[in-house]
Each structure stands twice: as structure tokens, then as C-alpha cells.
Regions:
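The feature marks the mature, well-folded catalytic cores of soluble enzymes
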Residues: 1-285
């Protein structure tokens, strides 16, 4: 009731809210939730991968069962269940343009604490599972304080019209400068399925945010959420960079409303807006 009252106070439509009481380990739905594909007849396919707490760094015994609970015991999701639990995969570790290209990082998907497979084996699995034509691998790029082994949703994201937005560090004294500069060069070398370079739009590096023990946190503007008519993006009480990020996203998503969401509380848990959400296409609810 307290959740419903809080949401109602913000003017949201309570009739569109579905609640289920399920045990969880953490808050990061992006990494354990179903990944959805659509069949040619628009039937949703709900792909259920194994989640192991980002390489067994944290407990995941409850989170790893949430999909099962939502589909079989709290039947609020519709579509065809697809068993993929023989492969460890987090939603934040992959980025698809919906046209046959997928962007990911070697540091995460080739980590020995995920799957005991080499790069070609992982790529073949991804292509078959997601009906892909190419997988674009990033070897460089990281954020201090990141527990995920460099999830791509913190570094670089696909946008409409063969555009990629990515985190760029301009401060040569910042610890991220070299790695993000090398990532930028990799992005410049990538090609679309038509053989053309991607249109690249740099997002500002968020000003450093620290926890109580003065450890740097992985604040990033790449962790935005795409919706039908809007893009929600994280802000960090940093007016100049928050506004610059909004300008870049407005250029990348013409016609969509760009809405900032204060993520100063979320980032203290080492994640942000995209990490804590998972979108589903029409027909799943």
C-alpha cells in the first residue's frame, strides 16, 4: 500500500501498476530479468538466462529465480518461455540495435567467471540465440567502482539512424582517460551492416562521485532508458554535465522527450537508471 500511495502522489496511473511480492537479493532487474524477442507474428519470446551475481561476486539465489516466479507462480507475464539457463548472461552486458548488430565487451562476456567458452563460441551462441548478423566487441573501456566487469550499458549505446553514443573523458589526468580513448578508437573502426561508419556522439564523463569511504562510483550518462516517446536519463546533481548529456541525447533521439531522473541515491549502490529497469514490448503484460 505504501508503494501504491507514493506512486499515486506523483500522479501516476495506479491501474497500470502490477505488484508481486517476491524475495530478492538486490535491485538490478536489468541483469536477471527476461530478455525479450518477438516472433514474426509478434508473439513475445521470454528468454530466461542464468544470473550468477556478476561472476559470483554477490549472492544471486533469489534474483536468479525471479523470472520463474513471475512467469509460473505469479503469472503476470505473457509470451513463450524460452529456457536459456545453461548460459550466463546479464541484460546490461549486451546492446542490440534491433537490426542484427549487437555491441558488447570482452571483459564481461569472456570473463572466466561467466561461461567457459572462447570468443568464437560466445559469438556463435549470441548470433544463433538473438538472430544476429554481427557482434561488435569492445576490448577497452571501464568505469571505476563497476562490479559488472564493464557492462556495455555503462559505456556505449545504440541510438536510431546508425548512431552510437558513448562516454568520453577529456581530462587526461582522470584514471579513465586512456581506456575510454582506446574505446573511442574501437568505435570509430566499427561498421554498420551496410559497411558505413557509425555516427558517434560523445556523452560527457560525469563528475566524480564517491561513496562514504571515498571510493569512486561508476556514474555514467550512458545508462539511460529508451521508452516509446521519451528517453529517461540519469542525473547526478551536476548541472553542467547533466545538461550537456541531455543535449547529446536530444540530438541522438530527435522527437523524443528527454527526461532527467535523479540517480544520486542509486549510484551509491554502484548502479544507475538502466541497471534498475527492464522494458518489455507490448503483449508481455
Amino acid at each position: 500500500d505504501s508503494i501504491r500511495n507514493s506512486i499515486d502522489n506523483y500522479g501516476a496511473d495506479i491501474q497500470k501498476l502490477i505488484t508481486s511480492k517476491i524475495n530478492t537479493n538486490d535491485t538490478w532487474a536489468r541483469d536477471h530479468a527476461f530478455i525479450t524477442l518477438l516472433k514474426e507474428d509478434a508473439t513475445p519470446l521470454l528468454l530466461d538466462f542464468c544470473f550468477n551475481g556478476w561472476g559470483m561476486k554477490f549472492a544471486a539465489n533469489y534474483d536468479n529465480q525471479i523470472n520463474n516466479e513471475l512467469y509460473f507462480h505469479h503469472p503476470v507475464l505473457k509470451g513463450e518461455y524460452v529456457f536459456c539457463r545453461n548460459f550466463i548472461l546479464e541484460g546490461g552486458s549486451i546492446e542490440s540495435d534491433g537490426k542484427g548488430s549487437l555491441l558488447t565487451t570482452e571483459q564481461c562476456l569472456l570473463a572466466k567467471n561467466r561461461n567457459e567458452m572462447n570468443r568464437q563460441e560466445v559469438e556463435d551462441f549470441l548470433k544463433e540465440t538473438f538472430n544476429l548478423k554481427q557482434v561488435l566487441w569492445l576490448k577497452h573501456g571501464y568505469l571505476a567502482g563497476d562490479d559488472t566487469d564493464s557492462h556495455v550499458d555503462t559505456l556505449a549505446r545504440f541510438c536510431p539512424d546508425d548512431t552510437i553514443v558513448y562516454v568520453k573523458c577529456t581530462n587526461e589526468k582522470d584514471e579513465h582517460y586512456k581506456e575510454l580513448a582506446m574505446m573511442e578508437e574501437e568505435l570509430k573502426a566499427f561498421r554498420t551492416l551496410n559497411g558505413r561508419p557509425y555516427r558517434l556522439l560523445p556523452l560527457p564523463m560525469a563528475s566524480a562521485v564517491y561513496d562514504e569511504e571515498h571510493h569512486r562510483l561508476p556514474a555514467t550518462y550512458a545508462n539511460f532508458l529508451i521508452m516509446n516517446e521519451a528517453v529517461l536519463y540519469p542525473t547526478y546533481a551536476d548541472f553542467v554535465n547533466d545538461m550537456r548529456a541531455k543535449e547529446v541525447l536530444a540530438e541522438a533521439f530527435p522527437g523524443r522527450e528527454i527526461v532527467g531522473i535523479d540517480c544520486t541515491a542509486l549510484i551509491k549502490q554502484h548502479g544507475s537508471l538502466h541497471c534498475v529497469t527492464m522494458q518489455y514490448p507490448e503483449g508481455v503484460y
